Amino acid sequence: CALAEWKFGAGKGTKNMVFLTFGTGLGAGLILNGKLYTGTNDNAGELGHIRLSDFGPIGYGKKGSFEGFASGGGIAQLSKMYVMEKLQTGQKVEWCTLQELDQLTARKVAEEAAKGDKLAQSIYETSAIYLGKGLSMVIDILNPEVIVIGGIYTRNKNMMEPIMQKIIDQEALSCANRVCKVKPAALGEQIGDYAALSVAANLTD
């Protein structure tokens, strides 16, 4: 997917790009100096494992991890925490009862947030804050031209981008931040086809 977005999508024309999957989990693909970077034993890009907080949803087996805050599974966990807190204090959540708690999904919360529900919006705001914190580290360490984010971020960009960018502007090294753009993935449902093409092209380069 990283190769596809680099060769054909939102990262086309760059030499240094980071691609983040923001779906069931969180992972990254790194293009550095015009080449796919995989690390010493192919473990480069496991950004989801980074701990951003001592508390929070669990992702990659670690509480408060980047994946815990910035993935579908993590947002679902975060939602359960926020909703349970409301229910335990006797408050009603129109879109989720105690019996429905285990069925909560990131998509459901996004739908409610889009309708203007303040609780649902606060859940995505928390995710966006920690996304900004995580990306600030990426910008400081790798100094990329572009960070491309797929999945949930692409579908909820309007809700998440302003909060995420505010955190990046506060946290990231200003000289590195100035030259880095954060973009939603461009290839959408076609990314699988483009990925196959880009892998084949990369093997012949």
Regions from the PLM with identified roles:
Residues 21, 31, 51, 148:
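Conserved beta-strand segments that form the floor/walls of ligand-binding pockets within enzyme
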Residues 1-5, 20:
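Glycine/small-residue-rich loop that forms an oxyanion/phosphate-binding "nest" at active or ligand-binding sites
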Residues 5-14, 36, 54-205:
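ATP-binding/phosphotransfer module of carbohydrate and carboxylate kinases, centering on a glycine-rich
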Residues 3, 26-31:
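Short beta-strand scaffold segments in enzyme catalytic cores
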Residues 42-43, 160:
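Conserved catalytic-core motifs of eukaryotic protein kinase domains, centered on the activation segment
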Residues 16-21, 27-29:
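Short glycine-aspartate micro-motif
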